[in-house]
Amino acid sequence: VALFKPDPDRSIEDIVEDLGREIADRFRDAEDEAIAEVAARARRDMELAARLPEAAAGAGLTVAERREQNRILAELAATRARALADLARLGERLADGLRPADLAARLVALAALEGEAAAAASLGIGGRGLRPVPFTSTAGQAASMVAVSLENRLTNLRERITRYPRDAYQRIVAMYTPSTLLGITTSQVQQARIVQRFLAEGITGFVDRSGRRWTIGAYAEMAGRTSVARAYNDAGVWRMQQNGIQLGTISGGADACRKCAPWIGKILSFDGTTGDVVLPHATRDEPVTVHIDGTLAQARAAGWGHPNDRCKVNAYSPGLVIPQRDFEYDKQAEHERAEQRRLEREIRSAKRDLAAAMTDTDARRAARDVAKAQAEMRGFLKQTGRKRASYREQLHFADG
């Protein structure tokens, strides 16, 4: 049985970021390789198309030019047939390397073990001398449904990866029918830009329950981060309940969103209890009246624990100070976080345009866009004092 030593001192933010990034990287790398292979074949087609003879104004092709045209068109047809076969095999290979069932089970188990360890340490039943715990522990079992849900989502992404290389190339071939290649419709420069924009979009078409659209990298990251946070908190709550703790409080970042902010610092029950209750004081031999603001289920129903949320459920000790008890929603802080995410997407988008460029001119234009977006990010960080997360600006990161 695989062993893992959880660290109760790791923050949930770090755990969600690290494990979510692993999923995002895995699917983003597969997407990037697929796009690069399709782009290489599209560039080759363009180079062949550029060699097609063009008739002078008001005149037709000569016999020799007609033969050359037929030869190039035949070569295009042959290379396209080979490309379709190669790209079909590429899609299968990339999909085989993703292994969504193994990935989901491992990452959710890691998150659950971390959550249980953190809860145990906070209750004084853990400590720094934690022994390695097998994946078959109760924490992993408690998170099994979360793992199944994540596996189903990742399997859907895997199927899209399988089809994408061949489907994308066929879309590009449709853009380069013989009539367009012969200059009857769009110029070659315009055609190259159309292909570049299409490839830069990546694998799209993922829609969540709220109707929001995602790219494959963003969806993989969102699914991973959400499942990791849920497994972490569920395992922690399970450990608390096993030790007779039925109350908790939520902690979150200073830039928490409007859905989470109302619940940060509130006392919530795990068993449905609400209102005023009298409980033994955590450190003194006396009773204390505790006001329970709501239940964990109510918080989730109101939007807490939404996709990409990184809030944490902590055990509440009656009579002791509640961390973040007076927390207030900061609209400006949330706006700055959202703006940083937008700038990161702009940088990644420019880098994707650069990777998918069909011509040297387009590559130079995309490189200027990358530099411009990076300069805008530097100015924003200087103005707000926020920390830069350079890894989120890389192509292999998600778009969320």
PLM region descriptions:
Residues 206, 214-318:
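Acidic, glycine-rich two-metal-ion catalytic cores of nucleic acid-processing enzymes
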